Amino acid sequence: MAPVQLDNHQLIPPGGGGGSSGGGGSSSGSASAPAPPPPAAAVAAAAAAAASPGYRLSTLIEFLLHRAYSELMVLTDLLPRKSDVERKIEIVQFASRTRQLFVRLLALVKWANDAGKVEKCAMISSFLDQQAILFVDTADRLASLARDALVHARLPSFAIPYAIDVLTTGSYPRLPTCIRDKIIPPDPITKIEKQATLHQLNQILRHRLVTTDLPPQLANLTVANGRVKFRVEGEFEATLTVMGDDPEVPWRLLKLEILVEDKETGDGRALVHSMQIDFIHQLVQSRLFADEKPLQDMYNCLHCFCLSLQLEVLHSQTLMLIRERWGDLVQVERYHAGKSLSLSVWNQQVLGRKTGTASVHKVTIKIDENDVSKPLQIFHDPPLPASDSKLVERAMKIDHLSIEKLLIDSVHARAHQRLQELKAILRSFNANESSSIETALPALIVPILEPCGNSECLHIFVDLHSGMFQLMLYGLDPATLEDMEKSLNDDMKRIIPWIQQLKFWLGQQRCKQSIKHLPTITTETLQLANYSTHPIGSLSKNKLFIKLTRLPQYYIVVEMLEVPNKPTQLSYNYYFMSVSTADREDSPVMALLLQQFKDNIQDLMSYTKTGKQTRTGTKHKLSDDPCPIDSKKAKRSGEMCAFNKVLAHFVAMCDTNMPFVGLRLELSNLEIPHQGVQVEGDGFNHAIRLLKIPPCKGISEETQKALDRSLLDCTFRLQGRNNRTWVAELVFANCPLNGTSTREQGPSRHVYLTYENLLSEPVGGRKVVEMFLNDWSSIARLYECVLEFARSLPEIPAHLNIFSEVRVYNYRKLILCYGTTKGSSISIQWNSIHQKFHIALGTVGPNSGCSNCHNTILHQLQEMFNKTPNVVQLLQVLFDTQAPLNAINKLPTVPMLGLTQRTNTAYQCFSILPQSSTHIRLAFRNMYCIDIYCRSRGVVAIRDGAYSLFDNSKLVEGFYPAPGLKTFLNMFVDSNQDARRRSVNEDDNPPSPIGGDMMDSLISQLQPPQQQPFPKQPGTSGAYPLTSPPTSYHSTVNQSPSMMHTQSPGNLHAASSPSGALRAPSPASFVPTPPPSSHGISIGPGASFASPHGTLDPSSPYTMVSPSGRAGNWPGSPQVSGPSPATRLPGMSPANPSLHSPVPDVSHSPRAGTSSQTMPTNMPPPRKLPQRSWAASIPTILTHSALNILLLPSPTPGLVPGLAGSYLCSPLERFLGSVIMRRHLQRIIQQETLQLINSNEPGVIMFKTDALKCRVALSPKTNQTLQLKVTPENAGQWKPDELQVLEKFFETRVAGPPFKANTLIAFTKLLGAPTHILRDCVHIMKLELFPDQATQLKWNVQFCLTIPPSAPPIAPPGTPAVVLKSKMLFFLQLTQKTSVPPQEPVSIIVPIIYDMASGTTQQADIPRQQNSSVAAPMMVSNILKRFAEMNPPRQGECTIFAAVRDLMANLTLPPGGRP
């Protein structure tokens, strides 16, 4: 049995027991079931071939599986018909058989691991047995030889001399000669003998060649090395020699090589098989032995064979050519092997050009039967013409054995013949034609329009495959070329009309190419509504319409005509045509004017210089050649001959001049005097100068005259390559303002106005003139303001002169830089579209990139300036508002979450709502409103904006009064101000709810204007007074008793907030202020600030002096001794409510301008005054430094830095936040289980719990914090320090920044807790307030009054974090004290629940987020549980503080672990 091969190519030799085990297995089968094959049947089936090297293990396994499967299928068919016991027996027997087979296979595989070693041992044993047999057989044969054949044999005498020679000398000199000659080769001949022999053999060969009849084809021979080599190029190479010098000795053919090659289809392989060469070798050798002329016979034999082989090669090349490239263009007419090959090309019937009898061009290659020694002969039918001997000679040879080259040479010659015929036709039409034929690629180059470049010539090719004409002309569409080819192939004489047609087409192409760099659109046809009746219809049909894209209503028409007796030349006529404007895009236009250009081009230029139109003149006649060249030169000397310089000049001239003509017409239509179109720069540029510009509306006659006097020149020019950009140059002299820019230092100023013409509008149309007049109006409007500003400069106050400077004035824009460092800028220019001044703000220098503080009131500044365009007044407003706005812009305006009980609603801390240029309203959390009025001399007036401006008993809808605002603002009043105030008692007890200044404002607003703004004083040369005349107190007050009892409605001057980004509730009585009148510049009510809400500010210090000449006393007004305050602070009359603010003692008021932004802690509280609900509506005067302190974020005064929170805010925010927290507290007390106690003290809230009495009020020292005063019902239960901790915690952590209502709710719930629980909470608060006192603890604690974002998700972040029912739930934040400096300290949120019934303190079991760590909560819970087990609670004792303290002392997180 052959071995078995495993998957890894290991052979398993079949081994013992297979057959016997198989037999045993088969005998155990049941009689009812078919006998299974023996277990080794699979192996036996494969072992039939004994020569097989082995069997694959996979094959054996596959056989076994098939057998098991077949037996199983048999069982499934037979078992259902048997009883249960028989079925079980059959199943057991099947399982046993199958198991036994696979066990045997397993044993075979295990045995196969050592089969290789066994096989090697068997092979060695077999080899040794064979060797033993050989030895035994040799011994038997020798014994038989000795006993039978050599019985009488005797040995010779011992060769002792030979033995002595061998043993002594090592040689055998006495070796017999017969043996020596058999085994020892003779010595080789020497090199000299070899050369002599070969030289002698060469002489013998030369003698034999001379004396032998040698064919002339074998003349190419070489004799060397005793051989002669005959070489016939392209056929064969034979090497011969002779075996002796006898002339009768025959030639010997040593080597034969066939030189026939097929370089195109042979793929480098030999064409003759080696067996064929051997046969030919034997055949030639036999001829050399027997023939009388052996060499002639050898040549004839090999030559015939090579010609037949060449013919076969050409035939195979033809078949491949037909199959791969030429197809039906070449056909095999006849092929006789070894005789001839006939091919046909240019078969018109095959090509489908003609039917019936048609000329067929044949090429025949055959062997000359008469003279076999000749090479292959080539015949052409019909015969080739003798026009070009070189082409014919090439077509009659087949040197390289290439059928394709032979065909190409043949058709090349025939193509040259066809081109000669076509050239003859052209010469019959034009005797002077100059076409040429190129022989490299058969082509006829025909010039169409002289002079003609190579790219403009018509190239006529002959397709070498089909013999058809193929045409090429650059730029001509393929469809026309196809028509020309079809017509020319049908009849060659049809080329003449096509040449005539192409001549006009080429003329059009030359015109298009000549003007393609110019703004034009060319077309051969133009849809005109009046084409038949207009003179344009009488022109030649060969014409070109050139549309000027910048002048869409004008065309240049080029007419092309024949030149008599000159078939290759054209004459051009040029016309100028104007058309009407189309109603729709698809509607045809009408031709209006058609005139021919003048005869002389220079006349056209003279017309332009004199201002006449260029579309008049007579017919323009040109020479036949637009680009004449010397006839001696080559006619196609360059492509510039195709450039029509006359047409290009006409187009460029019209494109340049017509816009000026259009502009001149528009200026004339508008009656604007000008000098017409003028030529500048030696004819390189054109311009139109205006003599006078019409006056502008809304400009005074004086300003108009001054502007006309300063204007020196106004010139219009075209700029840019597209001639669509107009530049108007204005030259001014005597500029009223000189900026700091170096460009504005000369005696004259140049202003350039640029206008872009749209593509849909004609260049130089009315639109350009209208835009210029609008710009001129803008210049005049701004010039009027600048002129007035220049007149006021000599008398401008010194502070304004230092505050501002003129940076740029270019007649279109005025840019002023202002501020202490001149880092802010304001730009003023007139907007002709909106017909008003436009103001832009910015920053320059080191401040560039920052925001201008006046951007807040930009809209109000713009409206004010448009109402009263006075630059001095604008600068005064900027001066008065810069410092307040810088302070206001520091207020936080970002919306915040969690400020109220609706934690998801964002509230804006401060909303800045500018009402006018000097009136800014601040809304705090959409509840409280503060009005800030910017006044001169560095002061502002502040009032409670919740009160109506006209009736202090009425409130603005949406706002609430801020209690204590007047007292809080008085803390920032500077006692050293020039204007003296009234007493504090009179401030809080004014004589009337309506202030005197408010009356003045209302009276002045209701009265008609009686004086112009900035009245000119005699003797000041038109300058405006910058200081108001001193007036007495009585002259500044108007008597109007009827106004005392008249209340204006609150919504008389309703307005909405101009601040769109900071949208807040917009009360109906937001009243903007009028423009300021600084330093006594009186402004009449008619010229008041025209804001979008236009009304007068009741507390503005800029109210004008009453025009009434009557003097009287205001009823109930106190008399003020000394000079009138109006002489020092304009607008501050004694009746002005700004003087009603209380003035504390000098030592009690912070001084303005001090470096400290916090109030002194030792300042005594202000004097207690009788409260008036509308006292805060009376403005309080503050300096800019005091306002900066009021609005600048600073630490909370009166608090230790450690106790103050990290949230910095301004004193105003702290005051309003404290007021709003007090308001929240009052509402919370009504909702919670607290009892409110009535209090007579204003601004004080008193309430009590079961064990405590609480008093909440603003800090009397600063009014910036809300303080809690706690008084226990049972003094023995509380220690003083515990009460102080509770009060400090309320002041710093509950009612402090950021002033959240939910912290109050949580704190009031703590106050309502039982005393023992509250005391433990107070101890925790003490650890938070004074963390340094607990140095032995590892953690700092923070009592969370609202749920932090990182807490377990039990409620939304920001909601109250204290729940007090049968159990108490609160949150603590623990922060690790020791931490690595680069890392943030580890903080964890611990929810703690205290069971009042059992007294246990545990961590609340709240599900954590999936991504949060559970290590820290588990450790916290374990520590609290261990504390509860170790310290069981006592009756009436709270364990909160003890458990928390133990947690802070024992909690240790694993290294590197974070919660």
From Swiss-Prot:
One Pfam family, short name: RM6_Med14
Highest taxon listed in the record's lineage: Eukaryota
Ranges for region Interaction with SREBF1: 506-830
Coiled-coil residue spans: none
Motif LXXLL motif 1 boundaries: 75-79
Chain positions covered by the region annotation Interaction with STAT2: 194-572
GO biological process per UniProt: positive regulation of transcription by RNA polymerase II; positive regulation of transcription elongation by RNA polymerase II; positive regulation of transcription initiation by RNA polymerase II; RNA polymerase II preinitiation complex assembly; somatic stem cell population maintenance
Residue numbers bearing the Phosphoserine modification: S623, S992, S1117, S1124, S1133, S1141, S1149
Residue spans of biased composition, Polar residues class: 1029-1059, 1097-1106, 1152-1161
Transmembrane annotation, as ranges: none
Keywords: Activator, Nucleus, Phosphoprotein, Repeat, Transcription, Transcription regulation
Main location: nucleus
Subcellular location: Nucleus
Statement: the UniProt record of this protein carries the keyword Transcription: yes
GO molecular function terms attached to this record: transcription coactivator activity
Compositional bias per record (Gly residues), positions renumbered to this chain: 14-27
Positions occupied by motif LXXLL motif 2: 1187-1191
PANTHER family xref list: MEDIATOR COMPLEX SUBUNIT, MEDIATOR OF RNA POLYMERASE II TRANSCRIPTION SUBUNIT 14
Family: Belongs to the Mediator complex subunit 14 family.
Biological role stated in the UniProt entry: Component of the Mediator complex, a coactivator involved in the regulated transcription of nearly all RNA polymerase II-dependent genes. Mediator functions as a bridge to convey information from gene-specific regulatory proteins to the basal RNA polymerase II transcription machinery. Mediator is recruited to promoters by direct interactions with regulatory proteins and serves as a scaffold for the assembly of a functional preinitiation complex with RNA polymerase II and the general transcription factors.
The protein, known as: Mediator of RNA polymerase II transcription subunit 14
Primary gene name: Med14
